[in-house]
């Protein structure tokens, strides 16, 4: 692998942008790809969008928000096939799975509800109405709370013990993806006007606001907790922005394709995977906490922009909507990529 460094630590943004544009990696034919597509799994549904995914690693199950079909799709990863579709999930968008409580949490945009399902039987346990446009969902096992993006400006908080609503967390318009730390009571929420909101999950209060400029429309987030690094995927001036999770200081920026929607951090291999609706997965290597380089750009297909990484299997799952532009594609799909080496 003959790659050239894209770190911008200690450089001005202008110089960094020029360097990032000029110094692109070159991959020889002998190099194995960092991600190899190994399987295609067919779902069912019409032309239209898919949204977020979640993984039950113990059972080998993948959950897919089949938005256009209004179903929660459950994939058997071992068999490589669609296992079940749970109907009645109007405009399903966000999904999270918690092994600690063996529950699947779903945010439905139409009708704005958060549904909780049994992780074994997939029976509905509780439906909590929030109002229109429920979206991303995360479960906090320490506090036993469910967080749901709602109405584009609010983070609804549900007590998972009795499913009562707590006081919501008001945030700037354009609220998108968010991520919780496992080791301390911190949450990082993307406000797409150009800030990452830092939230204390013990108090459910905003305690910080980190700008991502000159990038913007920050849509995706991942965390490297041991090294105190935030990875922010931005659609304006498309880039992976790396910042100190304690101070908000930007330490690096690497160009990526447009329309990013999901990021995953592969801690074992020191990589970040960015799935982009422009038709590619960007693979970025972490040299050290302050230095990063573009390792590869894996071609995919247009509008396939949501994904999740299964660390136990070393696999990335990409949601590929059924498209009118691909008449040979008769179903929405999940593309399975194996991380190499």
Residue ranges with predicted function:
Residues 25-341:
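Predominantly soluble domains enriched in secretory-pathway, periplasmic, or organellar proteins
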Residues 1-2, 14, 18-19, 31:
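Terminal low-complexity, poorly structured segments
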């Amino acid at each position: 692998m003959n790659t050239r460094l894209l770190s911008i630590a200690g450089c001005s943004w202008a110089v960094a942008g020029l360097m990032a544009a000029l110094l692109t990696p070159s991959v020889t034919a002998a190099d194995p790809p960092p991600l190899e597509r190994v399987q295609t799994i067919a779902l069912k549904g019409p032309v239209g969008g898919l949204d977020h995914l979640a993984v039950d690693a113990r059972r080998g199950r993948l959950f897919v928000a089949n938005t256009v079909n209004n179903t929660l799709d459950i994939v058997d990863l071992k068999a490589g096939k669609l296992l079940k579709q749970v109907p009645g999930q109007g405009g399903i968008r966000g999904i999270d799975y918690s092994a600690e409580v063996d529950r699947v949490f779903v945010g439905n945009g139409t009708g704005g509800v958060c549904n909780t399902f049994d992780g074994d039987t997939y029976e509905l346990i509780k439906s909590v109405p929030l109002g229109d446009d429920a979206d991303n969902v995360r479960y906090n096992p320490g506090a036993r709370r469910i967080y749901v993006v709602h109405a584009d400006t609010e983070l609804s908080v549900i007590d998972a013990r009795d499913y009562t609503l707590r006081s919501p967390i008001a945030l700037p318009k354009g609220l998108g993806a968010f991520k919780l730390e496992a080791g301390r009571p911190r949450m990082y929420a993307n406000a797409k006007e150009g800030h990452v909101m830092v939230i204390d999950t013990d108090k459910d209060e905003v305690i910080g606001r980190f700008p991502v400029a000159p990038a913007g429309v920050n849509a995706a987030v991942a965390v490297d907790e041991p090294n105190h690094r935030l990875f922010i995927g931005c659609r304006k001036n498309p880039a992976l922005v790396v910042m100190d999770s304690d101070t908000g200081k930007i330490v690096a920026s690497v160009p990526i394709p447009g329309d990013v929607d999901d990021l995953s951090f592969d801690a074992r291999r020191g990589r970040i995977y960015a799935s982009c609706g422009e038709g590619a997965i960007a693979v970025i290597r972490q040299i050290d906490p302050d230095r990063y380089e573009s390792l590869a750009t894996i071609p995919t297909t247009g509008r396939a922009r949501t994904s999740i990484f299964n660390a136990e299997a070393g696999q990335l799952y990409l949601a590929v909507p059924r498209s009118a532009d691909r008449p040979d594609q008769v179903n929405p799909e999940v593309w399975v990529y194996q991380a190499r080496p």
